């Protein structure tokens, strides 16, 4: 589509520096830490600093210097508010850093590599066990051969498939055709609860 177009190659960082008048530099790793603290503190969310996509259009002067002057005249307190929120979180992180030693790191790595990897399998076991005990039946996980038939496990003699709720929203071309009874589950991120949905005829 652009085969016949002329290409112009610019050093964006250099051009940006010409407009802003400076290139802000930070010591190694510091921006990663500040970014993480900001994510936790939610310091630059719209409710703190304003909805940037709207404010930039409200500014009557459509230049960098005009925008900077306008925002600082109207919302300079929001910069301070965001700074305070992030700074407080940095202090919390500093305190947490004092608690981290090699043994804690080893436990974290083990949890990530072993437990988190097996979370899907663990969820299947929990779901099968919960529903089977409720019905007074035995349960088991599927064999590799049974898995190839979309079976994740058995409750009594009933084969079942276990899928996350997000599976339901997939397009039919992505979603597999499953003829057996399906159990759905939802595990919200950072929630301790697992929600199970089924209408099994067992």
Curated annotation (Swiss-Prot):
<dbReference type="InterPro" id="IPR019068">
    <property type="entry name" value="Restrct_endonuc_II_MjaI"/>
</dbReference>
<dbReference type="GO" id="GO:0009307">
    <property type="term" value="P:DNA restriction-modification system"/>
</dbReference>
<dbReference type="GO" id="GO:0009036">
    <property type="term" value="F:type II site-specific deoxyribonuclease activity"/>
</dbReference>
<keyword id="KW-0614">Plasmid</keyword>
<dbReference type="GO" id="GO:0003677">
    <property type="term" value="F:DNA binding"/>
</dbReference>
<protein>
    <recommendedName>
        <fullName>Type II restriction enzyme MthZI</fullName>
        <ecNumber>3.1.21.4</ecNumber>
    </recommendedName>
</protein>
<keyword id="KW-0378">Hydrolase</keyword>
<keyword id="KW-0540">Nuclease</keyword>
<keyword id="KW-0255">Endonuclease</keyword>
<keyword id="KW-0680">Restriction system</keyword>
<dbReference type="Pfam" id="PF09568">
    <property type="entry name" value="RE_MjaI"/>
</dbReference>
